[in-house]
Amino acid sequence: MIFKFSQKALVALYLVVGLAEAVPSKSRVVSRASTFDYNGIVRGVNIGGWLVLEPWITPSIFDNAGDAAVDEWTLTATLGQDQAKAVLSQHWSTFITQDDFQQIAQAGMNHVRIPIGYWAVSSLPDEPYVDGQLEYLDNAISWAREAGLKVVIDLHGAPGSQNGFDNSGRKGPIAWQQGDTVSQTVDAFRALAERYLPQSDVVTAIEALNEPNIPGGVSEAGLRDYYNQIADVVRQIDPGTSVFLSDGFLSTESWNGFKTGEDVVMDTHHYEMFDNYLISLDIDGHVKSACDFGKQIEGSDKPVVVGEWSGAVTDCTKHLNGKGVSTRYQGEYANNVKYGDCANTTQGSVADLSDQERTDTRRFIEAQLDAYEGKNGWLFWTWKTEGAPGWDMQDLLANGVFPSPLTDRQFPNQCA
């Protein structure tokens, strides 16, 4: 789900340079038959940590499995097929239910983005993963239909790992684009598309691949070729479905001219805790950074949705940098500078935050909402956690920190 390496600083360089030419911020895609027009505004949330596990979202699952379980691959390998299937089935059936979708709709949102791994549809030899996720994804589509929500299906993990992050299913070296991994990914994507794109009243978009890591070694030319293959698959099945394309941790405007006008939407992610400079900012600096990012994405010649972002400004959440990995904020990881204390923010509820922390979080969230709606909207990461203040929209809403209604502002015009 998230950017977890120091090369975020490289990406920041792309975002602070001025645009060489002005590009209209509301460039339109071609006329479409879809039930959602992505020239408009997306307001939604990710259903993270459900069908693709992440240690920081559900730390209890990983902590109960022992030290070796650091991602879904090692979790299932450690538990074995039978126990892993039992543990995950219990999680899938209880962590997210129809009531969550009703709450999301009642909060005023129009979209959910649902991550799914290739292993849910394409079992490969000698891999420990268990399947069974599609039954729950089927349920989610039905729940979204009843709630009046649109769905972006997000291929979140590819064979070999496209980014080396635990959210790809397997933490470690990036092996995607080696051997048959790209063709295997296309096969998995096609299986998802054939199953879900016919439900175009609800599934209005599908994402080619989450966070392929170009700064980390993924070939940009190879990624563009993969995107072309994916677009062909979608057009063969349902030409009315939009395709979300990750920017690969490059600037969105670096993709200008690529598949422009072809019903594609750029997906960019913005976090301010995985980089030593950004994590050092005070709240005024975080607000300015978010507003500046919103101005930068206006340079894209395609619709842009900020498909992941949060209210957090530190990396204090337990396991956020990886299971058992310490924090930048307290000077324990990737630097020797201490920026602050993680007291009350490692685990718990938004209610446990100080009044000032809640106020600052509200300011930061409002600034991002305004910034991202300057282009084509947003999908917050994530709906629910086991206790990660700043990341848990359900908890933020319940404690009055996430705006309700979504247009309510206690701190108006921050990006003016």
Swiss-Prot record:
It comes from the Eukaryota. The keyword Nucleotide-binding does not apply. Keywords: Carbohydrate metabolism, Cell wall biogenesis/degradation, Disulfide bond, Glycoprotein, Glycosidase, Hydrolase, Manganese, Metal-binding, Polysaccharide degradation, Secreted, Signal. This is Probable glucan 1,3-beta-glucosidase A. Beta-glucanases participate in the metabolism of beta-glucan, the main structural component of the cell wall. It could also function biosynthetically as a transglycosylase. The active site is at E211 (proton donor), E308 (nucleophile). Disulfide bonds join C291-C415, C316-C342. Transmembrane segments: none annotated. Its cofactor is Mn(2+). The gene is exgA. It catalyses: Successive hydrolysis of beta-D-glucose units from the non-reducing ends of (1->3)-beta-D-glucans, releasing alpha-glucose. GO terms for cellular component: extracellular region. The keyword Glycosyltransferase does not apply. Belongs to the glycosyl hydrolase 5 (cellulase A) family. It comes from Aspergillus fumigatus (strain ATCC MYA-4609 / CBS 101355 / FGSC A1100 / Af293) (Neosartorya fumigata). Pfam families: Cellulase. It is found in: Secreted. Monomer.
